[in-house]
């Protein structure tokens, strides 16, 4: 009897073989759910929430976040896979598949009496060798636009259909190249992803500027301003109550009138300073003037600004204030005391767009914008959500490629190369640990196998062809998913991120090893004592 039973008679316990069987069963169950998602030919999953919301996706990260996984081991694997997505933006499905396959291959040897610790040692040796091979396979490239397009397309085609992937690829690459600055880290928060429920998903486009999800609040203000100066400010243009509890006392109606006028004058002076700046910079030209304020603007102030031909937007979101300065230039001001031309940004075109009851303000034609907007369009909510998830992964794929300074061949080529190298390397290892290396090599081949299977080809036949071609050509060979034939991934422009593969090898080995070495599962928390 398990020792825990003596302490707590209601505890549940699984030991030795039973514990391993439970864990391997959970890993393979999760693998079976996700295996049909892998690659550009993967199938969709429909997630229906408790409230009846429908989500169509084949993004492993979304699935693992949304699914309610109750099994503790499956939940652990899901957390590792979603952490991979948070760090590198890709490789979620591959992570689950490889962990499941490592445990499956290990199970074959354990059932023949091999101790899990020996397999774990073999896995560790294989991982170190696999990382060495990955270093040799990676291709250092000058990061030109064509390489970025190939990397983004490879990532996006696994998330959305090919026609949409082609549209998104151009937009995603141009947005990262626009915000990229030499010798600075790339900040993807400077790419605003704005959704608009309108037209079809292929109308998604890149705006070299900013889109705000609100419009002007005064009927007389211009709907379109060409060649505009932009003043971004965080100044209250309405009367605000004091922060401390205070009051004004008056004896007569005249005194009250004076107080009201003093309050009004306080705001009018601020507005007048903005109007004076507009008159100063636009006096000799037809240039427009736009004020974007983070705080409120009262109706009187709006009226005064409208009379002088100024387009004013109030209550802009805080995150957009930083983006405005980067997109249009200029400086966001917190006071109207020292306004000058240097504070102003510039945009070639500012216009308001009305869609149903929603209003949007487009700020376009900025010179060298360091912040841009991806305007995602789609007919319904779940299409928009799917595109946004894909765009985020595409952005991170390009960022990874730029930061790594290298790429690795995709389409299952890397896994085939590493597996071949491990089979050769196995003969140099003494003792039974070589079986762990063999198991690791066989497990990695799950990626090309599933890619072939999801594309409707015979997985064994396709894999044999690819391995034969690799042996003959000595180049990384992947699978052409349109024909099922081997192809040189580099020539076809199918590239994966180096950091994704590196992270994949590390995390899969660690988790698979940890799960293998579990020999007892106990459920003995306080909740199981009730009743």
From Swiss-Prot:
It comes from the Eukaryota. It is found in: Cytoplasm. The keyword ATP-binding applies. InterPro entries: Chap_CCT_zeta, Chaperone_TCP-1, Chaperonin_TCP-1_CS, Cpn60/GroEL/TCP-1, GroEL-like_apical_dom_sf, GROEL-like_equatorial_sf, TCP-1-like_intermed_sf, TCP-1_chaperonin. The keyword Glycosyltransferase does not apply. GO terms for biological process: protein folding. GO terms for cellular component: chaperonin-containing T-complex. Gene3D superfamilies: GroEL (3.50.7.10), GroEL-like equatorial domain (1.10.560.10), TCP-1-like chaperonin intermediate domain (3.30.260.10). GO terms for molecular function: ATP binding; ATP hydrolysis activity; ATP-dependent protein folding chaperone; unfolded protein binding. Keywords: ATP-binding, Chaperone, Cytoplasm, Nucleotide-binding. Its main location: cytoplasm. Component of the chaperonin-containing T-complex (TRiC), a heterooligomeric complex of about 850 to 900 kDa that forms two stacked rings, 12 to 16 nm in diameter. Belongs to the TCP-1 chaperonin family. Component of the chaperonin-containing T-complex (TRiC), a molecular chaperone complex that assists the folding of proteins upon ATP hydrolysis. This is T-complex protein 1 subunit zeta-2. It comes from Bos taurus. The lineage of its organism: Eukaryota, Metazoa, Chordata, Craniata, Vertebrata. The gene is CCT6B.
């Amino acid at each position: 009897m398990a020792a825990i039973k003596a302490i707590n008679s209601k505890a549940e316990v699984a030991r030795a073989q039973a514990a391993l069987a439970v864990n391997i069963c959970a890993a393979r169950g999760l693998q079976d759910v996700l295996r049909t998602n892998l690659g550009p030919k993967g199938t969709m999953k429909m997630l229906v929430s408790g409230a009846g919301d429908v989500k169509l996706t084949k993004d492993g990260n979304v699935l693992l976040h949304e699914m309610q996984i109750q099994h503790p081991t499956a939940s652990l694997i899901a957390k590792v896979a979603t952490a991979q997505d948070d760090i590198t933006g890709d490789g979620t499905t591959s992570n689950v598949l490889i962990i499941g396959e490592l445990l499956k291959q290990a199970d074959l040897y354990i059932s023949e009496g091999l101790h899990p610790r020996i397999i774990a040692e073999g896995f560790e040796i294989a991982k170190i060798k696999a990382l060495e091979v990955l270093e040799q396979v990676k291709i250092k490239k000058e990061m030109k636009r064509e390489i970025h397009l190939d990397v983004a397309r490879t990532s996006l085609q696994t998330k959305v259909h090919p026609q949409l992937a082609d549209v998104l690829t151009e937009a995603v690459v141009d947005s990262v190249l626009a915000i990229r600055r030499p010798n600075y880290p790339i900040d993807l928060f400077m790419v605003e992803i704005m959704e608009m429920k309108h037209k079809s998903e292929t109308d998604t486009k890149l705006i070299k500027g900013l889109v705000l999800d609100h419009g002007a609040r005064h009927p007389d203000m211009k709907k379109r301003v060409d060649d505009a100066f932009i003043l971004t400010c965080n100044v209250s243009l309405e009367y605000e109550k004091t922060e401390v509890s205070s009051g004004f006392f008056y004896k007569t109606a005249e005194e009250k009138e004076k107080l009201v006028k003093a309050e009004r004058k306080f705001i009018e002076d601020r507005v007048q300073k903005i109007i004076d700046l507009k008159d100063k910079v636009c006096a000799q030209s037809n240039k427009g003037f736009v004020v974007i304020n983070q705080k409120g603007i009262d109706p009187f102030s709006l009226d005064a600004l409208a009379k002088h031909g100024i387009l004013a937007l109030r209550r802009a979101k805080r995150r957009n204030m930083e983006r405005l300065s980067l997109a249009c230039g200029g400086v966001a001001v917190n006071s109207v005391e020292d306004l000058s031309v240097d504070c102003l940004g510039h945009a070639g075109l500012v216009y308001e767009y009305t869609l149903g009851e929603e209003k949007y303000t487009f700020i376009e034609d900025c010179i060298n914008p360091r912040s841009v907007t991806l305007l995602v369009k789609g007919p319904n909510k779940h299409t928009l959500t799917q595109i946004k998830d894909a765009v985020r992964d595409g952005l991170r794929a390009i960022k990874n490629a730029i930061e790594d300074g290298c790429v690795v061949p995709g389409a299952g080529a890397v896994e085939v190369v590493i597996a071949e190298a491990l089979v050769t390397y196995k003969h140099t290892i003494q003792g039974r640990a070589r079986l762990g290396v063999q198991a690791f090599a066989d497990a990695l081949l799950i990626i090309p196998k599933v890619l072939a299977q999801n594309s409707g080809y015979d997985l064994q036949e396709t894999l044999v062809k690819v391995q034969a071609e690799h042996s003959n050509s000595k180049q990384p060979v992947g699978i052409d998913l349109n024909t099922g034939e081997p192809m040189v991934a580099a020539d076809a422009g199918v590239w994966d991120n180096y950091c994704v593969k590196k992270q994949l090898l590390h995390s899969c080995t660690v988790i698979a090893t940890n799960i293998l070495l579990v020999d007892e599962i106990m459920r003995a928390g306080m909740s199981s004592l009730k009743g």
